């Protein structure tokens, strides 16, 4: 079961332009026809900002800046439907490569790019006070599979994994399989959210098809789900079908701090 601190794909590894273009094409064209598929993705957009603290700055400085950023956004009526999360790497094979991941989740591309234009016009003073240096900015299309039932907590945990589909498997096939597994997991007490993430720009050349995100609103829920998978779900028909369609690896775990909840 499960982008963030090494660039969405290495975030953070790399492959050719044609495959990258193919991912984009199926991400868009998949919405045009639901024939032969049980579930319909409802995509959103997400921006992943990854980098290092400026000299003398730390996570507290970034969180403080984030709180000012949320106030600025409200005063300027900017991206009020956007959810913003600050993440910090916990388990990773290259933990020193980045200090943070800043995530913006936006409902659609029109709102994303319209608001970016506004940010470039009126947000420069705010940007000049940023206590970090972004080393990679990744634009993605996301297919949410599910969300945790309890969303009151602003603190949580997420695991990202790079996934490559087996021959003949499409993204829509994978989405249906994940939906079926998620329903099975929920019936066994699981309370995690899941999504498929397709890097669109900024990830470089990649050697995977998508990034799988598994996230919880609490450490307890996440730990329960890990145990529950091994004890009750790993040999289920839904899990075996899902795992037969895809190979996932390069997993990394980050803690999450939601500083703005989108008003959808």
Stretches with model-predicted labels:
Residues 18-19:
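N-terminal hydrophobic targeting signals that begin at the initiator methionine
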Residues 23-34:
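Hydrophobic h-region of N-terminal signal peptides that target proteins for export
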Residues 1-15:
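Single conserved hydrophobic/aromatic residue that forms the stacking wall/gate
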Residues 33-264:
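Short S/T/G/P-rich N-terminal loop/turn motif that feeds into the first structured element of a domain
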Residues 5-8, 30-32, 254:
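Intrinsically disordered, low-complexity serine/threonine-rich segments
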């Amino acid at each position: 079961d499960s982008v963030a601190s090494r660039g969405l794909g290495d975030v953070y590894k790399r492959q050719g332009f044609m495959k990258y273009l193919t991912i984009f094409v199926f991400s868009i064209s998949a919405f045009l026809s639901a024939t032969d598929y049980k579930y319909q993705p409802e995509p959103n957009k997400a921006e992943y900002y990854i980098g290092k603290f400026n000299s003398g700055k730390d996570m507290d400085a970034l969180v403080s800046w984030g709180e000012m950023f949320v106030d600025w956004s409200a005063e300027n009526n900017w991206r009020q439907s956007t959810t913003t999360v600050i993440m910090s790497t916990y388990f990773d094979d290259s933990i020193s490569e980045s200090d943070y991941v800043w995530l913006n989740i936006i409902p659609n591309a029109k709102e994303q790019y319209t608001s970016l234009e506004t940010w470039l016009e009126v947000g420069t003073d705010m940007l000049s006070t940023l206590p970090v240096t972004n080393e990679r900015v990744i634009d993605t299309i996301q297919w949410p599979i599910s969300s945790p039932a309890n969303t009151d907590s602003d603190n949580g945990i997420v695991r990202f994994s790079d996934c490559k589909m087996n021959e003949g498997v499409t993204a829509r096939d994978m989405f249906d399989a994940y939906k079926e597994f998620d329903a099975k997991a929920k019936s066994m007490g699981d309370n995690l959210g899941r999504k498929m993430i397709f890097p669109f720009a900024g990830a470089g050349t990649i050697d995977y098809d998508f990034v799988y995100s598994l996230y919880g609103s609490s450490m307890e829920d996440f730990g329960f789900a890990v145990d529950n998978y091994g004890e009750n779900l790993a040999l289920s028909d839904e899990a075996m079908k899902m795992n037969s369609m895809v190979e996932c690896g390069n997993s990394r775990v980050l803690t999450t701090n939601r500083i703005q909840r989108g008003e959808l």
